[in-house]
């Protein structure tokens, strides 16, 4: 299948804190040559504004997305370069558009990544709700037996949320808490963000170079 014919990944961004995780996942997908269908929930726009100062607007989403993807996790603008060719592989769908392509099982998507996923999002998907396009697309992904990765960003977790996470696992989703590791020698907050984003891409089967992989003794010899 040519790159032009490759089916897109749906990326859903919920209202949980952690919009830098979503930006890193998006950069990783685009760097790997993937196409993206982006769904940014209403709640996530408020979080994005708080965390980055960027107001994501449907009418100016390309401009806002470019600024978002260029920004580092430390808030510094123009940390990353994203080409126009990469941005051209992103399609944006309004969160309230329940007639959008990703709302149908016949829409040819590879799968869906929800990054970050709030507990409200987890509950909605676990219960099969379709209050917006993000939840509907996730339900469709499950019923079509496609890959669904849910990067939960919350702590502590209630018993109710844990049960809902189990329900998602049993339905075929990959439940991936946004928990960074420290064995790769992280020195900046971006390293921790990229580790989580890399694990999301690992779960999706998308190659990347976002973090240094464990190869037995990353930090040198260790006594047992």
Outline where the language-model segments fall:
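A cross-family phosphate/adenosyl-ligand binding-site feature
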Residues: 1-148, 156-224
């Amino acid at each position: 299948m040519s790159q032009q014919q490759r089916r897109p990944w749906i990326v859903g961004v919920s209202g949980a804190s952690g919009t830098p995780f979503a930006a890193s996942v998006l950069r990783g997908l685009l760097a790997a040559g993937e196409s993206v269908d982006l769904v940014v929930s209403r709640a996530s726009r408020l979080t994005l504004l708080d965390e980055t100062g960027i107001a994501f607007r449907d009418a100016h989403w390309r401009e806002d997305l470019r600024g978002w993807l260029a920004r580092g996790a430390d808030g510094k603008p123009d940390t990353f370069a994203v080409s126009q060719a990469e941005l051209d592989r992103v399609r944006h769908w309004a969160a309230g558009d329940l007639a959008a392509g990703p709302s149908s099982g016949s829409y040819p998507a590879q799968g869906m990544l929800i990054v970050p996923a709030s507990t409200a999002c987890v509950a909605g998907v676990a219960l099969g709700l379709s209050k917006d396009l993000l939840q509907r697309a996730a339900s469709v992904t499950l019923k079509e037996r496609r890959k669904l990765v849910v990067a939960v960003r919350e702590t502590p977790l209630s018993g109710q949320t844990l049960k809902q996470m189990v329900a998602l696992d049993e339905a075929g989703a990959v439940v991936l808490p946004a928990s960074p590791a420290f064995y790769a020698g992280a020195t900046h907050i971006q390293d921790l963000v990229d580790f989580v984003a890399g694990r999301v891409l690992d779960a999706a089967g998308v190659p990347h170079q976002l973090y240094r992989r464990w190869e037995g003794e990353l930090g040198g010899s260790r006594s047992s």
